[in-house]
Design a protein with these regions (language model features):
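Short, mixed-charge aromatic SLiMs
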Residues: 132-152
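Residues that form generic nucleotide/phosphate-binding pockets
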Residues: 87, 91, 113, 141-145, ...
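Short coil/turn connectors between adjacent alpha-helices in alpha-solenoid helical repeat scaffolds
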Residues: 75, 79, 120-131, 174-176
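Structural motif
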Residues: 94-113, 149-161
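A non-transmembrane, solvent-exposed segment enriched in polar/low-complexity residues
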Residues: 1-104, 109, 118
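Long, charge-rich alpha-helical interaction segments
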Residues: 149-187
Length: 187
């Protein structure tokens, strides 16, 4: 089945949830966005607009982070993640969009997507505190400055889940290593 989506009152990011994942799209007046159900999965078809083509490129880049836990070691994720971060940074620098607000939102959205993927991976797979993620450049940067007070996290469809997984990780693997005040715990 192919169906058109509504026309929004204002341009911005919109999400369609199919029960498994969120499909992100950027819709502005006059855009026609169509989704088609294929074997139980929804796929955006007839991608229109520069913004949606860039979102689709990002979605394809992000696929490289998918791991097969049965055949790949836990630590194999982190070099792959750090490599994708470098690739994304280059891609964002080279990508020029006419809509500067969208360009800013794209960068923020990608940062939060990477953060969510990283924290989710650790939360699901880490077995001990002394673990491979600590060798990741992103991990070292993240632990010192997690954006817990950044309201933009809650603008993402996974915002609450991201905060929950981060605090569970800190409580399980970081806080128990020493005495911390509540403020230290939040930092």
């Amino acid at each position: 089945h192919l169906f058109p989506l509504f026309q929004p009152a204002e341009a911005g990011f919109y999400y369609l949830y199919d029960g498994k994942e969120y499909h992100r799209m950027y819709i502005k007046a006059g855009d026609e966005i169509h989704f088609q159900g294929i074997d139980g999965d929804w796929k955006q078809v007839d991608i229109t607009g520069e913004e949606n083509r860039l979102l689709e490129q990002w979605k394809e880049m992000k696929r490289s982070l998918k791991m097969d836990a049965r055949t790949e070691a836990y630590g194999a994720y982190f070099p792959r993640f750090d490599s994708l971060r470098l690739e994304v940074d280059r891609w964002l620098q080279e990508t020029v969009v006419r809509d500067s607000l969208f360009q800013k939102q794209l960068k923020e959205t990608i940062e939060f997507d990477l953060l969510y993927d990283f924290i989710s991976y650790i939360a699901k797979n880490q077995q001990s505190y002394e673990s491979e993620e600590q060798r990741s450049a992103y991990y070292r940067q993240l632990i010192g400055r997690f954006p817990v007070e950044d309201g933009r996290i809650l603008q993402q469809p996974y915002g609450i889940q991201l905060l929950r997984e981060y605090f569970n990780y800190k409580r399980t693997f970081v806080i128990r290593q020493g005495e911390y005040s509540f403020d230290d715990w939040l930092a």
